Amino acid sequence: MEIFVWCLMPSHLHMVIRVQGYKPELIIGRFKEFTSKNIQLAVKQNPHESRKDWLVSMFEKAALESSNVKNGKFWQAGNHPIELWSPDVISQKVEYIHMNPVEAGLVFEAHYWKYSSAIDYSGGRVVLDIDYL
């Protein structure tokens, strides 16, 4: 999987990726499974997490509402991969993804959001290795 653009928001994640030989839905499902298990484990094992009990109860409540999750649920059901078929569409999606924190009022400029590839595209420090578009 190649990651070109990403932005982690408080309630969701956006990515522009390329996968070859696999359906994007399968890759996203595996990604969600892996990260869900590890995030929940990190919360449960962190003695300094002040919201631990509340978070764990929310994971468990979400799992009860799902037919296919048993031990806690982190991500919403489903995913929404779309094919980016032209340079104009790609540019529009990159702009939309990077501007998400600005539109949400979390930062004044996209490259200030720590959890985004916007800083990489502005020449700043690298948080996650990406493949540039």
Describe these PLM feature segments:
Residues 1-133:
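Short catalytic/metal-binding and nucleic-acid-binding patches
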